[in-house]
């Protein structure tokens, strides 16, 4: 009788643990990779853009050192380029070819790797091109050029 009761109790605990595991999603299932978080930022850029064509990730700078907390904002820096796909098509940008002489934008800000929290703070500025061997980023009133020269 005592062993039946212990067995029944153990069975109930196993059932509770199983149900708890199904209800509480694991942290790793909710965490994005650094690249996935940046691609999500590019999607947001395309959603909020008023420009005619979609942008696609062109270059991704090195990720920051590993941080265990996916909810902590991570600094990010990446470059996007205009594609041939019109924005209204809603086609995934990864399937679009880059537009010849399309606009290029340098983007900086922060992203989180947590799928539940969604704070993105990204600013993108158009890259005006190369001047005297230097890459220049321009805003309405001034340009900043980096590199040789």
Curated annotation (Swiss-Prot):
Chain intervals for the UniProt region annotation (Disordered): 61-80
GO cellular component: extracellular space
Single Gene Ontology MF annotation: lipopolysaccharide binding
N-terminal signal peptide: 1-29
Keyword Isomerase belongs to the record: no
BP GO annotations: antimicrobial humoral immune response mediated by antimicrobial peptide; defense response to Gram-negative bacterium; defense response to Gram-positive bacterium; innate immune response
Residues where Arginine amide is found: 148
SS bonds (residue pairs): 85-96, 107-124, 136-145, 138-143
Name of a matching Pfam family: Cathelicidins
SUPFAM superfamilies: Cystatin/monellin
Positions of the propeptide removed during maturation: 30-130
Record key words, sorted: Amidation, Antibiotic, Antimicrobial, Disulfide bond, Secreted, Signal
Main location: secreted
UniProt cross-references to Gene3D superfamilies, sorted A to Z: 3.10.450.10
UniProt keyword Oxidoreductase, yes or no: no
Localization of this protein: Secreted
Family classification: Belongs to the cathelicidin family.
General function of this protein: Microbicidal activity.
Name the record gives this protein: Protegrin-5
Organism: Sus scrofa
Taxonomic path: Eukaryota, Metazoa, Chordata, Craniata, Vertebrata
Gene: NPG5
């Amino acid at each position: 009788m005592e062993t039946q009761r212990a067995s029944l109790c153990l069975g109930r605990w196993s059932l509770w643990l199983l149900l708890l595991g199904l209800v509480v999603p694991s942290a790793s299932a909710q965490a994005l990779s650094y690249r996935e978080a940046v691609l999500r930022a590019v999607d947001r850029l395309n959603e909020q853009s008023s420009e005619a064509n979609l942008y696609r990730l062109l270059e991704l700078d090195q990720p920051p050192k590993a941080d265990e907390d996916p909810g902590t904002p991570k600094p990010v820096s990446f470059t996007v380029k205009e594609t041939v796909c019109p924005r209204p098509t809603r086609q995934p940008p990864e399937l679009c070819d880059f537009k010849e002489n399309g606009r290029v934008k340098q983007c900086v800000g922060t992203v989180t790797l947590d799928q539940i929290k969604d704070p993105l703070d990204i600013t993108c500025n158009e890259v005006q091109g190369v001047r005297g061997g230097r890459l220049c980023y321009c805003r309405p009133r001034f340009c900043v050029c980096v590199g040789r020269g």
